[in-house]
Swiss-Prot record:
Residues 213-222, 1179-1195 have a biased composition (Basic and acidic residues). Residues 928-937 have a biased composition (Polar residues). Coiled coil: none annotated. CDD domains: CAP_ED, PAS. GO terms for cellular component: monoatomic ion channel complex; plasma membrane. GO terms for biological process: membrane repolarization during cardiac muscle cell action potential; potassium ion transmembrane transport; regulation of heart rate by cardiac conduction; regulation of ventricular cardiac muscle cell membrane repolarization. Pore-forming (alpha) subunit of voltage-gated inwardly rectifying potassium channel. Characterized by unusual gating kinetics by producing relatively small outward currents during membrane depolarization and large inward currents during subsequent repolarization which reflect a rapid inactivation during depolarization and quick recovery from inactivation but slow deactivation (closing) during repolarization. Activates even more slowly than KCNH2. It comes from the Eukaryota. This is Voltage-gated inwardly rectifying potassium channel KCNH6. It comes from Gallus gallus. Belongs to the potassium channel family. H (Eag) (TC 1.A.1.20) subfamily. Kv11.2/KCNH6 sub-subfamily. Its main location: membrane. The S4-S5 linker acts as a signal integrator where it both couples voltage-sensor domain (VSD) movement to pore opening and closure, as well as providing a binding site for other domains that regulate activation and/or deactivation of the channel. Residues 609-629 dip into the membrane without crossing it.
């Protein structure tokens, strides 16, 4: 099965690979030459090739090699592709612009579940970029960890690298330095051993990784560095010293501009310091002789000292440049010379601790600056930020958003507790002693109310400094304008709600004061308008609306409960008979009121719960009657509550039911549609595999579209709005696809209207083998695979195009492979007829579109394009209509099947029509196989027994008269418009009979070649031998039909000539034909010049009775007369050798015109041939129908020359 049987895990791997940022390609190991089936965008950007140019090429990447690419590297790559193990190698590759670079290629085989390699992944890395990235990495973090670990270690350093630190140290700001900088410059064979460095176990784990990285860097660096003059010391295996220590040569990394030096061994710290001073002196001498020094010391010499705490961008860049210079600063504070440990083979950068602190400080300050969005961090090219006054708060700032939600919670608290406090708490009688002796802070609710009042006052102050948006959509930050805007808006309501009335009238315990406080506190409920405005944005969500409606219902019930208690409490002292609901409540719960005891009666809790129960039962129209109104005031209030309840019940709960129905509407539609699908499956008895695919696709499509039919939605809008919507839906394709660049907005709108969107789940087959390619596909998301005989030949991803090149073929072909989705795919597709229709409307954009359209994979099956008799008739009509399209008119375009241009086709025709080189029977079969029966019609008038001769419709010479020029032009334009497919190869038909050979006809040959060049049909197609006989039979039938049609035309011509002969004056008559009124016939006088007929073809054997000389002259006369009548088609039948078309009835019947002897008939014939052939009868207008009938026959599209 090959790679067609990819498991789901591999499909996920392919989809993940398509989204990676690496530069790679995928090749199929089971195809010839391991053809490339996919390359990502990074690969295309690296080498400059498009995906179309890379697909199906061998993965040996021969197109990337150049003159400097070594054959050994190519052989290594080829050997890696023959193996089954991962391999890395370096190759010199060339980009499309001929620039070369060293590339690191990683060949990774992909195996299937059987362990067989089915694919190769080739990952490409620019070696120069890889070295630049790795050289910029710093190892000081790991070294700082090694110092803190306290483990001894012996390190070997590259002396030239250590020597460069002097220049770096001199360029850095001078400060207290607690480390030792060692610089060396003298080459020698000594080495330096530093012992007792502390390292951590973590570093030991990464040594091998670092060594492998340096190994990869070492070779390219040596090749790229022209200054290297010393050989590279080879790495020696570590050997155990006499005291059990290890001695080893380390890698010496080459850097640009540097040189290699050896290391010498020192045994004490004094020798270490002596060596340090010696090399410092030599370095100063070297630096004096050469400005800037060598290598990295030269880079460091021009760096100016920079304060470590600088925070500007330029200073940070300078300091970053300094920090990237390799530093070898050694701290000997924690050295222990008695402990030895085998050192790493890599160079290690050591940075003094206070330098690390400075870097950390700079990074912290930089991060702080970025987080604060300072002006020096913002880009140079930016929008001008609005100028904000000091202490002004932006209305869209996070602080204002949090503050608004806090005020919203306080308003909700006010809406709940203000009515409760005004109704229940303020009417509670307290002892005078407690009331006067206790301060305001005795009641917790008073403390909370005080905090709420303070917050409302602060909110007023903040609103005076908060920006707003004016009617011009401008942010206003001017304090004066903000104040005016706030005064005109919510200031009065906020001010009333923020006044602490209970503090202003505290300690005045009269009843009037208590009632006033309760009424004033209810003014805070005006802030609920802000709550409604704040929560209005959530009105589109059904669940949020449902929650808000329930809260509103509960809040209104709470308010009504407070009012219900206030009515009963106010009326009770004035009633003689205690019949109020509060007295009834006391009797029911056993807590009767006692006028002498103010604390008697039900508690506040009992009163509130009972009042709330009554209001809820009244609002919901339940009303059990256990709490009933008894007084008139209570009854009136109950009526009001019932009215409010009916309205609220109808609005709120009706809205709730609608919301619930809307929430479940999608589910209901899903179940309804799913039921239809199941009924369809059951009714048609769909098999289980297909049934499962159908159900899975329906479920996924529903989750993707939620059951919304976009076509049904778009049909409800006008065309202009539909075009805008389609343009928005296809904007990504139209903007990113190269083929649509340069299109006008009207063209894009027309194309967007024709595009359809398709969604395909994994495993769904989009195109099957043999399907007619009537659609062009554009992939916008996901990946697909193309399979030929269950072998993956290509993997396409985002922005790829597959189908067939419509501009090269006038008739849709058939698919040569299966197209299957690997992941969930979104595709845009357009029908070829719709695309051609739009391009015909915009011919200026058509050429640009065809030139920029790059089809990633051509699905057209070029080997076999089956044709059926029914499809041929359709093909004729299709080509005839499509020939009028300007979008397909591309001159000198190579033939799609043969790859030949018009000039090559003309040369081919010249060879085929050369009489000196007649075609054999086999050659004729080959030529005939390229012709199609497209030109045959539905009316079958052929006579099987009629003789068939060679046919040649020859275009008359255009050198005679202007009429002949006009006729030739009209004939050529007519032929270019109506001939739809490859016609009978007329000039080559003479070679079908070996006894006949045509003469040279250069002008007709040129006309035929032009006709062929104006079509987009291949001249030669590869047909099987079995089809040649059918082609010959169709050719025979075609000639028979042409013969019968021409016979009927000749009969009409002869009838007309009989009427003309009676009016045309004889040759000896003094009347000149020019005396006729030319305007009556609508013919220009300049057309009176005689027409020179084509010379008759010589026939070797004249055995047919109709081919006698007398008959030939009469036939020539008849056909010459026909030329005068054929104003629409300027065709001339030369002679009987050229064309002898007559029926058996005509052959056996007497001639219509009695032939005269040649000497008597010659003058008449000459007069007819040389004179102007005008219809002599003024009644020629009555015979217009006959002319039209002739034109109708001649304009029949079945004639190959027309």
């Amino acid at each position: 099965m090959g790679s067609a049987a990819l498991p789901h895990a591999r499909q996920r791997w392919v989809s993940h690979a398509l989204d990676s940022n690496r530069k790679f390609l995928i090749a199929n190991a089971q195809m010839e030459n391991c053809a490339i089936i996919y390359c990502n965008d990074g690969f295309c950007e690296m080498f400059g090739y498009s995906r179309v140019e890379v697909m199906q090429r061998p993965c040996t990447c021969d197109f990337l090699t150049g003159p400097d690419t070594t054959k050994s590297s190519i052989a290594q790559l080829t050997q890696a592709l023959l193996g089954s193990e991962e391999c890395k190698l370096e190759i010199l590759y060339y980009r499309k612009d001929t620039s070369c670079f060293r590339c690191l290629v990683d060949v990774v085989p992909v195996k299937n579940e059987d362990g067989v390699v089915i694919m190769f992944i080739l990952n490409f890395e620019d070696l120069a970029q890889l070295i630049a990235k790795s050289s910029g990495r710093s190892l000081h973090h790991r070294l700082s960890q090694s110092w803190r670990a306290g483990e001894g270690r012996r390190l070997k350093f590259s002396l030239p690298s250590l020597r460069r630190l002097k220049a770096q140290r001199n360029s850095l700001p001078t400060s207290e330095f607690d480390g030792v900088a060692i610089d060396y410059g003298k080459p020698g064979g000594d080495s330096l051993i530093l012992r007792d460095l502390k390292t951590s176990p973590k570093e030991n784990c990464v040594q091998s990784e670092t060594e492998s990285l340096l190994e990869k860097e070492r070779r390219p660096s040596l090749e790229a560095d022209p200054t290297l003059q010393h050989p590279i010391p080879k790495q020696e295996p570590p050997s155990l010293g006499p005291r059990g220590s290890y001695s080893a040569w380390g890698f010496i990394r080459s850097r640009p501009g540097g040189s290699f030096h050896s290391l010498r061994r020192v045994s004490s710290l004094d020798n270490f310091e002596a060596a340090r001073s010696e090399f410092q002196r030599k370095f100063r001498e070297r630096r004096a002789n050469s400005e800037g020094g060598m290598g990295l010391s030269g880079k460091a010499s021009h760096v100016k000292p920079n304060p470590p705490n600088s925070t500007s961008d330029s200073d940070l860049m300078k300091y970053r440049t300094i920090s990237q210079i390799p530093q070898f600063t050694l701290n000997f504070v924690e050295f222990n010379l008695e402990k030895h440990r085998s050192g790493s083979t890599t160079e290690i950068e050591i940075i003094a601790p206070h330098k690390v602190t400075e870097r950390t400080q700079n990074v912290t300050e930089k991060v702080t600056q970025v987080l604060s969005l300072g002006a020096d961090v913002l880009p140079e090219y930016k929008l001008q930020a609005p100028r904000i006054h000091r202490w002004t708060i932006l209305h869209y700032s996070p602080f204002k958003a949090v503050w608004d939600w806090l005020i919203l919670l306080l308003v909700i608290y006010t809406a709940v507790f203000t009515p409760y406090s005004a109704a229940f708490l303020l009417n509670e009688e307290q002892g005078e002693e407690k009331h006067w002796n206790c301060s305001y802070s005795c009641d917790p609710l008073n403390i909370i109310d005080l905090i709420v009042d303070i917050m409302f006052i602060v909110d007023i102050v903040i609103n005076f400094r908060t920006t707003y948006v004016n009617i011009n959509d401008e942010v206003v930050s001017h304090p004066g304008k903000i104040a005016i805007h706030y005064f005109k808006g919510w200031f009065l309501i906020d001010m009333v709600a923020a006044i602490p009335f209970d503090l202003l009238i505290f300690r005045s315990g009269s009843d009037e004061t208590t009632t006033l406080i309760g009424l004033l506190k209810t003014a805070r409920l005006l802030r609920l308008v802000r709550v409604a405005r704040k929560l209005d944005r959530y009105s589109e969500y059904g669940a949020a609306v449902l929650f808000l409606l329930m809260c509103t219902f509960a809040l209104i019930a709470h308010w009504l409960a407070c009012i219900w208690y206030a009515i009963g409490n106010v009326e009770r002292p004035y009633m003689e008979h205690k019949i109020g609901w509060l007295d009834n409540l006391g009797d029911q719960i056993g807590k009767r009121y006692n006028d002498s005891d103010l604390s008697s009666g039900p508690s506040i809790k009992d009163k509130y719960v009972t009042a709330l129960y009554f209001t809820f039962s009244s609002l919901t129209s339940v009303g059990f009657g256990n709490v009933s109104p008894n007084t008139n005031s209570e009854k009136i209030f109950s009526i009001c509550v019932m009215l409010i309840g009916s309205l609220m019940y109808a609005s709120i709960f009706g809205n709730v039911s609608a919301i619930i129905q809307r929430l479940y509407s999608g589910t209901a539609r899903y179940h309804t549609q799913m039921l239809r699908v199941k009924e369809f499956i059951r009714f048609h008895q769909i098999p289980n595999p297909l049934r499962q695919r159908l159900e899975e696709y329906f479920q996924h499509a529903w989750s993707y579209t939620n059951g919304i039919d976009m076509n049904a939605v778009l049909k409800g809008f006008p065309d202009c709005l539909q075009a805008d919507i389609c343009l928005h839906l296809n904007r990504t394709l139209l903007q990113n696809c190269k083929a649509f660049r340069g299109a006008s907005k009207g063209c894009l709108r027309a194309l967007a209207m024709k595009f359809k969107t398709t969604h395909a789940p994994p495993g769904d087959t989009l195109v099957h083998y043999g399907d007619v390619l009537t659609t062009l596909y554009f992939i916008s998301r996901g990946s697909i695979e193309i399979l030929k005989e269950d072998i993956v030949v290509a993997i396409l991803g985002k922005n790829d195009i597959f189908g067939e090149p419509i501009s090269l073929y006038a008739r849709p072909g058939k698919s040569n492979a299966d197209v299957r989705a690997l992941t969930y795919c979104d595709l845009h597709k357009i029908q070829r007829e719709d695309l051609l229709e739009v391009l015909d409307m915009y011919p200026a954009f058509s050429d640009n579109f065809w030139s920029n359209l790059e089809i990633t994979f051509n699905l057209r099956d070029a080997d076999s394009v089956p044709r059926t008799p029914l499809s041929e008739e359709y093909d004729c009509t299709y080509r005839r209509v499509r020939r009028r399209k300007h979008s397909l008119c591309q001159p000198n375009k190579p033939d799609p099947d043969t790859g030949t241009s018009d000039a090559e086709q003309y040369h081919t025709y010249s060879e085929l029509t050369n009489p000196q080189d007649p075609l054999s029977k086999d050659q004729w079969d080959d030529v005939g196989s390229s012709t199609t029966p497209c030109s045959q019609t539905s009316d079958d008038e052929a006579k099987p027994g009629s003789p068939t001769k060679a046919l040649s419709l020859v275009t008359a010479s255009a050198s005679g008269t202007e009429v002949s020029k006009q006729a030739a032009e009209s004939s050529q334009s007519y032929a270019g418009t109506h001939i739809c497919t490859t016609p009978l190869d007329i000039p080559n038909m003479f070679t079908f009979w070996e006894d006949q050979r045509p003469n040279h006809h250069p002008e007709p040959l040129q006309h035929v070649s032009l006709v062929h060049s104006s079509r987009d049909i291949p001249l030669h197609s590869d047909y099987r031998p079995g089809q040649i006989e059918s082609r010959l039979e169709l050719l025979q039938a075609q000639l028979s039909r042409l013969e019968s049609r021409m016979s009927s035309d000749i009969n009409i011509i002869l009838q007309l000539l009989q009427r003309q002969l009676s009016q045309v004056p004889p040759a000896y008559s003094p009347i000149s034909p020019s005396s006729h009124n030319l305007a009556m016939y609508g013919i220009v006088p300049r057309s009176l010049e005689p027409l020179t007929p084509c010379a008759p073809l010589e026939d070797e054997q004249q055995t047919a009775p109709g081919q006698s000389p007398s008959y030939a002259e009469v036939e020539k006369f008849h056909l010459k007369s026909r030329h005068s009548l054929s104003s629409g088609m300027h065709l001339t039948v030369a002679s009987d050798e050229t064309m002898t078309v007559y029926s058996e009835q005509e052959h056996h019947s007497p001639p219509l015109l009695n032939p005269e002897p040649p000497h008597q008939r010659a003058p008449n014939t000459q007069g007819l041939l040389r004179g102007s052939r005008f219809p002599s009868l003024p009644e020629h207008l009555e015979a217009s129908s006959e002319h039209q009938d002739i034109q109708r026959h001649l304009s029949d599209p079945v004639l190959p020359g027309s």
